[in-house]
Amino acid sequence: MAAAEENSSLFLIFILTMIALPLVPYTIMRLCRAANVKAKTIHCRCSGCHRSGKYRKSIYKRISNFSTCSNLTILLLWIVMIFLVYYIKHVSREVQVFEPYSILGLEPGASESDIKKSYRRLSIQYHPDKNPDPEAHKYFVEFISKAYQALTDPVSRENYEKYGHPDGRQGMQMGIALPKFLLNMDGASGGIMLLGIVGLCILLPLMIAVIYLSRSSKYTGNYVMHQTLSTYYYFMKPSLAPSKVMDVFIKAAEYMEMPVRRSDDEPLQKLFVAVRSELNLDLKNIRTEQAKFWKQHPSLVKMELLIQAHLTGESFALTPALLKDYRHMLELAPRLLDELVKIALLPRSPHGFGWLRPAIGVIELSQNIIQAVPLSARKASGGNSEGIAPFLQLPHFTETVVKKIARKKIRSFQEFCDMPVEERATLLTQVAGLSDEGAQDVELVLEMIPSIEVDIKCETEGEEGIQEGDVVTMYAWVSLHRRNGLTAALPHAPSFPFHKEENFWLLLADAASNEVWLSQKVSFMDETTAITAASKAIQETQEALGASAKEIGIAIREAVDRVKKGSRLVMGKFQAPAEGTHNLTSFCLCDAWIGCDTKTSLKLKVLKRSRAGTRGHVAEEGPVAEDGIEEEEEEEEEEYDDYESEYSDDEEDEKSKGKGKVANGVAHQKANSDIDSGSDD
């Protein structure tokens, strides 16, 4: 067996290898990913967002961003690796192979006279009579004397030159990669050490795995608890009004688990008084309503009051303990709302469609939470059917400012956005009473607000017309434009303390029956992924139609160009319903901005199934009547009035009618639609 020092060195080399194998490639991957991040300003530059500090890269924040658990772990492992390399190198110098020629400073095969000369020279330097240093004495006895003896003795020299060792042929040595203290252990402490190794290497990882699995089993892939999804599914109803969505949202298990402290009672009472007008309490029975409100589960009371404090701007009065709960509540809100939308859109029997009304209500709630705008601001007022909510998301805007500009016949948010810049600046400074800096902030935010345009087409691949039972494919190009030229951007949300990306929900729905036939989430943040997805979808579609390689290449290039210009391809399939003309509406709703949603009306004519039962025999039956579709921006009172936003009173429909015959299932919605998200204008 090898010496204990060699075994210790082997053990350290083993540990170093185990650390380096995963650490080196992972570090390279992290560095490459960091190098590819583009330093581009995509957030709002108004004074409100600047003061919020979300995007301010101070030294402390940069250190905090770097000082994550993963980064600190990587740094610590690299320090351990460097220490191990240094220590192994030092140990390997101490544990040296016996080399007599090297010890005497000679080349292999030196003559006997050279050996004697070198020995005399080293003796003068290291001999105890010449050098009293104990280390010199030790080196002289253990190395120099032995080396001289090995090279001057004929037998020893011959053995060394032949076998590499003065004692002749040596047996093979094997080392064990274990530390020295384990090899020199007696039987009494061996059992304790064995138990320690078993506990550290087997039991501890097993316990960590059990704890992790027990906790992770409570959550879905989107880090939402399974209990939350079950609760949302149970309370989700097809007739759920937007004003009642809040009651379902706050029942999340994550919120129910938040602590309720006795010290919070008095601050919550004061908060209740401040936000009471937003709680939908019946003023005729106010005492009964208040008593009923406080009889709810304490966590529900606390969450609703904290959300209303955020929507009404009363969060500044929260105590430190409530402020911590408030921030945690807002941190969880985006992904909980995202899951709540998915629950509303979940296909249900008998037709396998989702529900439109609750889905719109959840997205409206998301808009209000991100922009910190009261839900009551969606009520129609002063002839403005969409309410004042879109205005209140602008910096320095209050109800008073909105009333002032309303006197100048500004009837909608879209009219305000479409005004010339100079005229709008005059309106803000001279009528609304804003300063020049305030007017500039408003312009910066207006430049960030997205304008959405949707081109949508429904067809059966490779066939003319749509017959009942066909698999219908929806192709939709969703195009985004901003006045500042950005495609990917973070919304203006100075009151929301966390980063929030824009997401858009494209819903193809039958508003009259409250059914969502198709839904998909659209993001403009990742252009590379969008190009890959669009290219793959176009290629598969063209190949199914039997297009040539050249035609496929041209179609892919056109799709890539559209993506780079700010469009996203959305595709989905659904089964054609029964024969007849179906009045559909495609909604494109943003979860972060108020007032930038669009909807497109289209008619889908479904023909009766041919007698042959296959699409291939349609042509033999005779020509099929060309299906007509009308692209409309008209009154939809019969289709959608029952599903208007609960925040709005009786709203007048002032849309102009524009009809034109185009292919079946095709519609185009220009940007800057005059609709509010969830109510008919």
UniProtKB/Swiss-Prot annotation:
Domain J intervals: 99-164
Region described as Disordered: spans on this chain: 613-681
Glycosylation sites: N7
Subcellular location: Endoplasmic reticulum membrane
Name of one Pfam family that matches: Sec63
GO CC entries: endoplasmic reticulum membrane; Sec62/Sec63 complex
Superkingdom assignment: Eukaryota
Main location: endoplasmic reticulum
InterPro entries the UniProt entry points to: C2_domain_sf, DnaJ_domain, Ig_E-set, J_dom_sf, Sec63-dom
Transmembrane segments: 9-29, 68-88, 191-211
Function according to Swiss-Prot or TrEMBL: May be required for integral membrane and secreted preprotein translocation across the endoplasmic reticulum membrane.
Protein name: DnaJ protein ERDJ2
Organism: Oryza sativa subsp. japonica
